[in-house]
Amino acid sequence: MKRIAILFFLFNTVIIFAQQQVTGVVKDNTGTPLPGVNIVEKGTNNGVSTDIDGSYKITVKEGASLIFTYVGYNSVTRLANASQIDVALSEEGGQNLDEVVVTGSRTAQRSNTTTPLPIDVISSKDLTSTGQATFDKALQYKIPSFNTVQTPVNDATSLLDPYEIRNLGPSRTLILINGKRKNLSSLLYVQTSPGRGETGADISAIPTDAIERVEILRDGASAQYGSDAIAGVMNIILKKNYTDGSITVRSGITSEGDGEMLGVSLNNGTTVGEKGFLNYTIDFSKVNLANRPGNVDAQGEADDFLDGSPAAVATVNEFLSRHPDARNINGSPETAAAKFLINGGSPISDNTNLYYNAAYVYKKVNSFANFRTPYWRPLSGDPYLNDLFGNGNDANPSYDGYGPTFEGDLSDYNGTLGFKSVKNGWNTDASVTVGGNKQTYTVNNSVNRSSILDADGNETYRENSPISFKPGGTSFNHVVGNIDISKILSDQISIGFGTEFRSEYFTVMEGDQASWDGAGADSFAGNLPENSGKWNRYNVGVYLDVAFDITKDFLINGAVRHEEYSDFGGATVWKASTRYKFLDDKITLRGSVSTGFRAPTLHQIYTQKSQYSFVPGEGIQVSGIINNVSPQARKLGVSQLQPEKSTSVTVGFGAKPFKNFNITVDYYNIKIEDRVTLGDRQYEVIPATDPAEQDEIIGEVAYFSNAFDSRTSGLDVVTGYNNIGIGEGKLGFNLSGNITFQNERISAIKNNSSFSDILNSLTFTSRPKTKWILGINYEIGKFGFSLNNTYFGESTFNQDGLASNEVRDADGKLVRIPGSTETERDDSANLKTEFLAKIVTDLGVNFNATEKLTIALNVNNLFNILPEWKFVAENEAGAALLADPAAVKTQSNLITFNQRYSRMTYDGSHFSQLGTTFNLSVNYKF
């Protein structure tokens, strides 16, 4: 026993003397302390971060090396051969693949090269260099797998542009702020635009100047983070600096002289107590309307709204001679925004830190519906319009149409309060997060055309209609509680586990009566009382994450998670990943396989935008969207919504064959089962069960369902070669791309769903199958130059029955639609539209006038490249149509609303239709 005790003592003595404690301070090359610098013992998971004063303390093995990394700075490696090691980091060289990332693992932090998952890291400098006005648009020109688009005349969609990663819609990317879940928007996209039927967080609300970096995990991560992480995770890391600040004044204008932009942003920091910090950002911006209408085709208008005769064309031409664009306003809306954000933290003991962040955003957007021309509803048919809209002229002195406006007020807030502590090597993080989004709407210059009589027999609307309406709105709120615990058990094993509780609330606010009564406000009817209400649910999740470094080169990682929802039950998902390095870490092989889930949002379950009306002889008719829990949905055979389930596989490699050069290539394959989809509007009739009752007619309605299974596969490529000495300056190249191999439905349509060619296009084919970004930057002296080229590949859009065939009976006669003079047409499409591949070039020049003053000029879309599409024949009948100019014009009128949207159809595009824009900013540091 005595010998064992002696051996035990000697063993522990060796361990103690084989380790050493290293302390120091990390500063930048101006001598300013840097908080949050990552220090990792090379070849291990052992790491710490610098405190508010740039100081650190770490225990490492004797003879170890320390790697110091910070976003936007060169990484530095130092041999731990002293008890105090002070380090100065230089901004030259910017980010690299050795940056430590916090996304993708619930155990130890790892660098980009040691993580088994594909992660993009975008610094604040990268974002601002794009010259884009908002965070989401900056990502569009930095991340090939990220797409966002602005669509014209789309009501509430104008408040929040849809975005997506890997063409999987906004609902399947989880947004985090400092690692905590951000609230969803209250907006449900219901228009014919990308993202239809989905919702996502409002990332455009986050001020760019508040962001230190963005980590984008391009891999399924439901096992670590829960619902919504099927396509990936975007973690927005906020700035922590407190010793300096800056103010930026931004201005911009398009090459056509509209869309004027003016903004000012302040980012600053201060100390709180001895070692606490507070960083804050205040941002105000105003963007004016930019209008890109087309010249309207008179014959198409006469055919659609009149009888198509020469007299009808003359009537239309009288108006178009004065207003060739039919007074339509479509482009980018008028927007004003105010954004406030804070991020802070303070130590409350030797091993416990308090942290917090909060943000509030207010945004007002003013857009327009299609202009109601006088020949749409002639004064002879509705004489009251002259009293409401007396805007005539000499040729038509009484009435000249009206243009409804759509005005939206959006507010978004989020906040987190938490504690992090370290005790006996156990890291504990406990937090509470709240967040919400509210949108209310106003419709002006419109009318309720319904013939509804009051008790005295007078018209309630029509000639007595108001011209301003409050259609109501929506709100979404959540409360999230998290407890995350992790520990590095040894040089080889680290674990993480935790729990999350989340409560969600969705509200549909009733509009004023005039906005919904009868047909409601023209252009945008309000929320009916029976469609309004408040709904909520809660869920609890637990997870376990284990990482095992079998050797310093070979890592395996596994995670499992179970969530229980109050409305649909439980879901269990898992993930396994691995990474292997060789050739002195020059080559890294990595891969992962995982299952995931996405719970249908409360918006998708409970949204109902329907109009009920009685039609003599036909009973009650319902049109619009019926919600998933309505009796009508059950009668139509629509099942209760269930979570989407996914299986994701990613395989790739990274290489650093020589200094300053890196490349990563990752293949992904994502299968989604029971995809939640908003189907097409369709005409439905529910037979009455009682012969004494009338059938219930479910008119032009759409509804959500688990409609089909899908598969998306592709390749992500990221490469960079930086710090190349050219003369007295430094040159850098970055090339990244996303190639989609497969993005399609792989099952039959389920649950009595309707899924047309249009929906198939919006879901699968209307986004670029290929997107590449080539960036070149050169810095010399006080000047910096950047040239960014973004290649948007081809995409296609199939309209339902575009140039379809007329239906004939057995005798070869044309079949008429009952009660109409129109001819029935089949569902075939002889033509489709194809958006042509385009390269958009952005040029940036910045001048460091002094150490504190920087002037930057960005010319976005330098060569004024505009979206362009063409017809493509699907068959011989389509080819014959393309040979007939008159037929081509007719079909073109169908998808551009008689050329109103000649630049950008309702089908969407992939970059701005505004053309060249000029942006000038002045930044002053203090």
Report each predicted region and the residues it spans:
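C-terminal beta-signal and adjacent terminal beta-strands/loops
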Residues: 7, 185, 788-818, 847-926
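Short, acidic, small-residue-rich periplasmic hinge/interaction motif at the N-terminus
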Residues: 27-32, 37-42, 65-74, 82-128, ...
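Short acidic/polar hinge/loop motifs at secondary-structure boundaries
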Residues: 56-58, 180-218
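Extracytoplasmic beta-strand/coil segments of soluble accessory domains associated
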Residues: 57-59, 140-185
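N-terminal periplasmic accessory domains that precede
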Residues: 83-90, 137-138, 142, 163, ...
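Transmembrane beta-barrel wall of Gram-negative outer-membrane proteins
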Residues: 243, 256-369, 374-381, 385-386, ...
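Outer-membrane beta-barrel transmembrane domain signature of Gram-negative proteins
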Residues: 394-396, 402-417, 421, 434, ...
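Gram-negative outer-membrane beta-barrel transporters
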Residues: 662, 667-801, 925
